[in-house]
Structures are given as C-alpha cells and as structure tokens.
Amino acid sequence: MNKMEHMEIKQLVVSMSLPIIISMVIQALYNIVDSIFVAKVSSDALTAVSLCYPVQTIMIAIACGTAVGFNTLLARYLGEKKFDYANNTMMHGILLGLVNGLVFLVLGLLFSNVFLSLFTSDQNVIPLANTYIRICTMFSFSVFVQIIFERIMQATGNAIYNMVMQGAGAIINIILDPILIFGWFGLPEMGVAGAAIATVIGQFCAMLIGYVITKVKIKELDIHMRNFSFSTPILCKIYKVGVPAILMQSVLSFMTVFMNMILAPISAMAITVFSVYYKLQNFLNMAVLGITNALIPIVAYNNGANRKDRAIEAIQFSMILSIFIMAVGTIVFQLFPKQLLAMFSANDQMYGLGIPALKIISLSFVFAGISMVLCAAFQALNKANTSLVITLARQLVILIPLTYGLMKCFGIHVGWYAFVVTEFICTMYSLFECRKMKR
C-alpha cells in the first residue's frame, strides 16, 4: 500500500516531517551553541562570530543547493535501476563537495579581511572574526561532503541515519565548545578559535560517520574511485536543478549581509542583536521548513494522482501546525525576551537594543509561517515562480528597502517593524494567489 495515497493525512504529514525537523534543528544548534559559549568570553567575541554568520549561511546554501540537484539525479538513477550511473553520480557529488570546500578555503584566506571591512573597522573585533572565518572555511569540505551523504541516505530511503550523523556531530560540537573555548582539562584557552575548531571537528566527525554508514549500510551504492568517470552531462544535470536551489537558499545569506550593512553605522551591538535574534528564530524556521519539506512531495503526489482532496487537507493541516509553532514562538519572544538574551551573556546595551527587537519582530512570526506553507504548496503545484516572487519579497525586495527607510527616518526600534509589514504584505499576496488558483 502506497502511504502517499492511502495513509491518513495528519499521520502522513507528521511522520514525514518529524525526521526532517529533528535534522534541521540539530543543524541550527551548531551556530547557536557557538554563540552562547563565545558570549561568555566577551561581547567583542560574540560580535566577531555574528559577523561570520553570512559566510556560514552561504556555504550551507551552496552545499544544500548542490545536494538538491545531486539528490534528484541520484534518486532517478536508483529508481531506473541504473546502478553504474548512480555510483558515478555519487562520486561526482562527493568530489564536488571537496572542490567547493577548496574554493571556500581559498576565498577565506584571501578575502576575509575585505568581507569584514564592509561591516566594521573595530580592531578588537576584526582579528577575532578573521580567525573564526578562516578556520571554518579551511575545513569547510566537511560540511559540503556531509550534506552529500545526507542526500545519499534520503535517496536510498535511509533518512533515519541522517539523525544519527547530524546528532553525533552536534553532540561532539557541544561537548568540545566549552573545553576548547575556556581551556578545560589542561588545554589552552582558545576563545573564538576554540569555537571554530569545535564546529569543524563536529562537522568532520559527522562527515566520517556519513561515509561509514554509506559504505556499510547502503547496499545499492559503492564508494570507490573505480566507480568515478568524469561526466560533463552529470555535472550539468546536477546544477540544472542545483543552481536555482542555490539561488533560493542564498536569499537568506544576502539578506543577512544587507541587514548587517544597514545596522553597521548604528553600532556593532546592533549587528550582534540581529544575529542573536536570527539564531533564536531559526529554531522556529527549521520546524516549519521541516513541515514544508514534507508537504511538497505529499501535495505533488496527490495532485498528480487526482486526489486533490488529500492535497488540500495536507496544506490545511500543515498550515495549522505552522501557525501553532509560530504562535508559541511569538508568545515566548513576547514574554521572555530578557531570558532569551541572557543566554548570550547580554549586557545593558544588548538588553536595550535586543528586548524591543525580539518583541517587535516576533509579531511577524505567524504571517511568516503562513507564507512558508503556501510557498511550499505553490512549488508542489508547479507554481515555482510564484513561490520565488514571495521568497524574494520576504527576504530582500520589500524587507531591505523598508528596513533601511524606517531606520534612517525613525531609528532602529521603528525599523524592526519592517519585518511585520513585509510578512503581512507577503501573506496577503500568498492568499490572493491561492484564491486565484482555486478559481
């Protein structure tokens, strides 16, 4: 019995989204754990790590976008029982991960100073941020290859191993962070460098676990260079799907860069507050993204099978779940902003900027949840352009100019309302497009 067509919709959405949510939340832990421990070193150290966040998001965007194209092609060859092509595709994916890591190693060594100079001239912060960026980019091959192994497991129906791999990496990172940052057990106190080293060790261990699982458990595939034969068509097929996915994923990276540029003239602490907000909010985003990632194949399958009733029910139930998650998040941000900031060793300046920011921006959460679900539904129903327009408007086209204008004219606290206005406009547009489709 095909569960996509016959399993009860609520059970189907939950069963498919839960492993994805867990994997995504674990991924979000890397940055937030670093920030919590680094904040105990100094506010300059936290600012330094915050400035590096866009670099990490662009690496993840390229890794995940490449992996989307890779996963699509690998799954197709496995479905067609073309195992030689599948093995060659797998080897291309792993080698692409290594090449992408090499590119970021070079970029990190050559251009980290140029990148950081866009946001700050503080000589207390720049050396710390430089150290963090260079360590993370030097060993970035780990995260690129790790994400390829994740997609291998998804394509072969072994998604449960993702949680093992990512969970192990996150736990190693959490254990090593205080040891390396504060110099426990006789080790030298490394501060920001220790946080970066803990992160890359966690990612490297996760990559190794992914390799072992693929080698031992995935019987359909065989990791070996004898299965590799350079193929331009395979690369083109990977990036035909991968490039649009990279661009979609990169929107967040560009948004954080532009926001940092808007906030830099106000103060370095304003950048830190925004980074802390985004890392906290990312837990909610990851939960909703887990739901939407599960929703897309459910809606696409049932729409294709002419079971539009099930497709509509899946969208409605996903909407309810997302609104609930975002509403809970809004309540937490409204009632406990000081406690949330306290995790990052906040000082009076951070509280003064951060408490209003968390309270104001959180008013946009429910609208964001609705837009994210409808964007996923549009993708599943072959309305990818509509989804792209909404995503660009939410993250760049409306948000950035509106934030800049409000902050320039009325100050930073009023500027945060740009998030609320943007999400409201995009939700209204999403609902309008939804009504058009119903007609």
Predicted regions and their residues:
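Small-residue-rich hydrophobic transmembrane alpha-helices
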Residues: 46-109, 143-162, 271-331, 335, ...
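Short alpha-helical transmembrane segments in multi-pass integral membrane proteins
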Residues: 1-17, 74-141, 189-243, 299-364, ...
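Hydrophobic transmembrane alpha-helices of multi-pass small-molecule transporters
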Residues: 58-61, 173-178, 207-211, 283-286, ...
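Residue-level hotspots within the lipid-embedded alpha helices of multi-pass solute transporters
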Residues: 24-28, 61, 101, 105, ...
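Transmembrane helical elements of multi-pass membrane transporters/channels
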Residues: 15-34, 135, 146, 169, ...
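Short runs within selected transmembrane alpha-helices of multi-pass transporters and secretion channels
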Residues: 67, 136-154, 162-170, 195-208, ...
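Helix-terminus/linker motif at the lipid-water interface of multi-pass membrane proteins
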Residues: 25, 29-47, 116-123, 179-190, ...
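N-terminal transmembrane alpha-helices
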Residues: 4-36, 40-41, 57-69, 73, ...
